[in-house]
Curated annotation (Swiss-Prot):
InterPro entries: CSD (IPR011129), NA-bd_OB-fold (IPR012340), RNase_B_OB_dom (IPR013223), RNase_II (IPR011804), RNase_II/R (IPR001900), RNase_II/R_CS (IPR022966), RNase_II/RNase_R (IPR004476), RNR_Ribonuclease (IPR050180). Residues 561-643 form the S1 motif domain. Its main location: cytoplasm. SUPFAM superfamilies: Nucleic acid-binding proteins. Involved in mRNA degradation. Hydrolyzes single-stranded polyribonucleotides processively in the 3' to 5' direction. Residues 189-516 form the RNB domain. One of its GO terms (molecular function) is exoribonuclease II activity. The gene is rnb. Belongs to the RNR ribonuclease family. RNase II subfamily. Signal peptide: none annotated. This is Exoribonuclease 2.
Length: 644
């Protein structure tokens, strides 16, 4: 009788349209209930029974109920699931399997089975890649997943690496393929094998990209020749190896090992500028004045070189600082180090006055045992030899940026536009409260940005610098020449690491076209997107493996009185994040560890400060002593507390 009643349908429609609804993202808690976060200000309570229909991170539409003045959300429609493809640990065996996603806020096991075509017999503790197949908000009774790939067994010592690479869908090994002979590119190669080129790298480096040679001209100016490994002499555009490199976009450097962009035979041998081996190279010759200015007469050319020495950063630095026992093999090499040192000092001086110089931060190196255990974490400060190479590379990349811009009008450029124009007024207002007066328009120019950065660098602490970081835009990869505000340069195009960066290989091909006077097509925009995405994934992978290894390394310090110096890097409502100065580990200090009485405590992300009873007690960039309260291995998180 009621089945096709149009009035009833209309009434239903009316009720539906009158019921309040909200769209937002589900936030789970460890207590079973959750919240629907609509925006920064508004959230609705989701009771535990309703949480069974959703997962942390799902974007949903929910019906809003009001009972006794309390609002709650009932999930109704799934807009975007949080989990699609994920990694996790398998529970159970054979016919009754489930998988717990490897995520700090996802604790529930999801029933699953091996997907068709997956041969592995899964058992308790195995790590796997899974894909969600069912969701309660899609009309299914429950969540369900397919196991699409076996990663490794529970006790594999290398779980951090294999699980992380699988999570981000990144390659586990070097690409296959060989390059048997050099291509005929129609390039005249200058024979520079007699010159004293040297490479300076870490002692363990095998993929040497760059060799340097300096000489003093009769008028006292210095001439620098930067010779760069030449993989495009072996790899044709559009070939199988080229396409594999294009997908990888970068060599992936993880703690303990790397996954190269090119086959190891090329990256570590045929292309690597090994000592006493003749190698093809792409070279740039520039003349540097006493004040560090690079002459306009820049020459790019193809060459053949033979590195005369594989030098290590620490040895060269020790020698220049009159420390240690290491000596250059002969006077020719010693003379090179002295000249390169002079170039470094004059270029550094020029950049201090006319561009910007990053503050030196140490690199942290994990020392690993045979079984992936962390034996030590060593802070490696950036020393004078690192700076020699850095100044030479920045100069060479500046030269490439100019030549590609002037001769072609395009290339693969690293572009950074400083501050987002939408933030300029807020930035000026913030600086004003700290006694720095800037013009909101001027600060958007390269000149104005550099001026502000120099003023910030002259401040007694980095606190103000940390406050304005959120107003900055991100660096981008672009085919269009543009300024790099972060470096304080009018344009910047890298070509000095073609063994490990695909964008540098593209710039090599463009520079070769310039050398030959040939026309060449502008690179496609999609390649810059692929490079940006891969750079993001590689960084996340490096961070994830690092978190795992830090947790392993500090696990035995939990609950002890061992003190660590730690720099405060961020303040949030829930507490503050710190970086341990000696090893680079990131730890979290929950607000209750800062002060027991919550009402007397104000943690302000906006101001980067922690106030107790109205007094600022901690602020971002402060260095404090902490102890490790707890290490949660399942989430790889380190909880610290201020040392008593």
């Amino acid at each position: 009788m009621f089945q096709d009643n149009p009035l009833l349908a209309q009434l239903k429609q009316q009720l539906h349209s009158q019921t309040p609804r909200a769209e937002g993202v589900v936030k789970a808690t460890e207590k079973g209930f959750g919240f629907l976060e609509v925006d920064a200000q508004k959230s609705y309570f989701i009771p535990p029974p309703q949480m069974k229909k959703v997962m942390h991170g799902d974007r949903i539409v929910a019906v809003i109920h009001t009972e006794k003045e309390r609002e709650s959300a009932e999930p109704e429609e799934l807009i975007e699931p949080f989990l699609t493809r994920f990694v996790g640990k398998v529970q159970g065996k054979n016919d009754r399997l489930s998988i717990v996603p490897d995520h700090p806020l996802l604790k529930d096991a999801i029933p699953c089975r091996a997907a068709r075509g997956v041969q592995h017999e899964f058992k308790e503790g195995d790590w796997a890649v899974a894909e969600m197949r069912r969701h309660p908000l899609k009309g299914d009774r429950s969540f369900y997943a397919d196991l699409t790939q076996y990663i490794t067994f529970a006790d594999d010592h290398f779980v951090p690496w294999w699980v992380t690479l699988a999570r981000h869908n990144l390659e586990k090994e070097a690409p296959n393929g060989v390059a048997t002979e050099m291509l005929d590119e129609g390039l005249e190669r200058q024979d520079l094998t007699a010159l004293n080129f040297v490479t300076i790298d870490s002692a363990s480096t095998e993929d040497m990209d760059d060799a340097l040679y300096a000489e003093e001209l009769a008028d006292g100016r210095l001439q620098l020749t930067v010779a760069i490994a030449d993989p495009t002499a072996w790899i044709a555009e559009g070939s199988k190896l080229d396409n594999a490199a294009k997908i990888r976009a970068f060599t992936n450097y993880l703690p303990g090992f790397n996954i190269p962009m090119l086959p190891r035979e090329l990256s570590d041998d045929l292309c690597s500028l090994r000592a006493n081996e003749v190698r093809p190279a792409l070279a740039c010759r520039m003349i540097i004045a006493a004040d560090g200015t690079i002459d306009d007469d820049i020459a790019f050319f193809a060459a053949t070189i033979e590195s005369k020495a594989k030098l290590a950063y620490d040895n060269v630095s020790d020698w220049l600082e009159n420390n240690g026992t290491w000596q250059p093999d002969n006077e020719g090499i010693a003379q090179q180090i002295r000249l390169l040192h002079r170039i470094c000092l004059s270029r550094s001086e020029w950049r201090h006055h006319h561009a910007l110089v990053f503050k030196d931060r140490p690199d942290y190196r994990f020392v690993l045992g045979e079984k992936g255990e962390v034996l030590d974490i060593v802070a490696e400060p950036r020393r004078i030899a690192n700076r020699i190479v850095e100044e030479s590379m920045i100069a060479a990349n500046l030269c490439a940026a100019r030549v590609l811009r002037d001769k072609l009008g395009f290339g693969i450029y690293n572009v950074h536009t400083g501050f987002d124009p939408a933030n300029a007024d807020a930035l000026a207002a913030l600086l004003k409260t700290h006694g720095l007066h800037v013009d909101a328009e001027e600060v958007l120019t390269l000149e104005g940005f550099c001026k502000l950065r120099r003023e910030l660098d002259a401040q007694p602490s980095g606190f103000l610098d940390s406050r304005i970081r959120r107003f900055q835009s991100f660096a981008e990869i672009s085919t269009e020449p543009g300024p790099h505000f972060g470096l304080g340069l009018e344009a910047y195009a890298t070509w000095t690491s073609p063994i490990r960066k695909y964008g540098d290989m593209i710039n090599h091909r463009l520079l070769k076209a310039v050398i030959k006077g040939e026309a060449i097509a502008r690179p496609q925009e999609d390649i810059t997107q692929q490079m940006a995405e891969r750079r993001r994934l590689n960084r996340m992978a490096e961070r994830d493996v690092g978190d795992w290894l830090y947790a392993r390394f500090l696990n035995d310090k939990a609950g002890t009185n061992t003190r660590f110096a730690a720099e405060i890097i961020d303040v949030s409502r829930g507490g503050m994040r710190v970086r341990l100065v000696d090893n680079g580990a990131i730890a979290f200090i929950p607000a209750p560890f800062l002060h027991a009485v919550r009402d007397e405590l104000v943690c302000s992300q906006e101001n980067g400060t922690v106030q107790i009873k109205g007094e600022t007690v901690y602020k971002v960039t402060d260095v404090i002593d902490v102890t490790i309260a707890e290490v949660r291995m399942e989430t790889r998180s380190i909880i610290a507390r201020p040392a008593a």
